[in-house]
Amino acid sequence: MQYINATEIMDDIDEPRLFEEDGVEALVVALVAPLLKPLGYRLVRVKLLGLNGLTLQIMAERADGTMTIEDCEIISKTISPLLDVQNVIERKYHLEISSPGIDRPLVRKSDFFHWQGYTAKIETRTIVNGRRKFRGALENVTQDGFILNIDAAPEEETVYVSFSNITNAHLVLTDKLIRDALKKDKNLRQQLIPEDDFNISESEINFSN
């Protein structure tokens, strides 16, 4: 097995996703994905939801995993005119631009690498060890797949899942994930904000409390 190393999982805006949408969602992907890349964003997922009548949810992020409200506004203003002109959704709908969230979908190999050690729910195309749905900790991520350490098994149980066999995958909210995700987000934001500005922000926060 060839394990993914630090060089291979460097943030890459061109890294392909493991899954593809179909139907109307696929048409939306074809329209918006080329618009996101020049702005420094990459698509995570497109989904039509029966919320508020009909909601078109577009998840996106920067290659480093960050995503702000301002980023969502930029994407919305960029893609809305094209979606209106192309009229791929004939019914009235609500457009929702969002970050992947803490319990994010895992859609690229690098997602699985970055979140090794955390709990995920996985669905497979074919039956593996008698089932298609799994929950467990991600371990030993390679270029071809990973080991899942199954939760709540009477005895220690692991299963190998190949990337080509996955139909759906996302992180599960746990105390550890929430704590570490917030810490990672704070560290990324500190890298993007000049030190003097960050110190001022911290002072203002402490003062307001």
UniProtKB/Swiss-Prot annotation:
SUPFAM superfamilies: YhbC-like, C-terminal domain, YhbC-like, N-terminal domain. GO terms for cellular component: cytosol. GO terms for biological process: ribosomal small subunit assembly; translation. HAMAP family: RimP. The keyword Transferase does not apply. InterPro entries: Ribosome_maturation_RimP, RimP_C, RimP_C_sf, RimP_N, RimP_N_sf. Keywords: Cytoplasm, Ribosome biogenesis. Belongs to the RimP family. Transmembrane segments: none annotated. The lineage of its organism: Bacteria, Pseudomonadati, Pseudomonadota, Alphaproteobacteria, Hyphomicrobiales. This is Ribosome maturation factor RimP. The gene is rimP. It is found in: Cytoplasm. Required for maturation of 30S ribosomal subunits. Pfam families: DUF150_C (PF17384), RimP_N (PF02576).
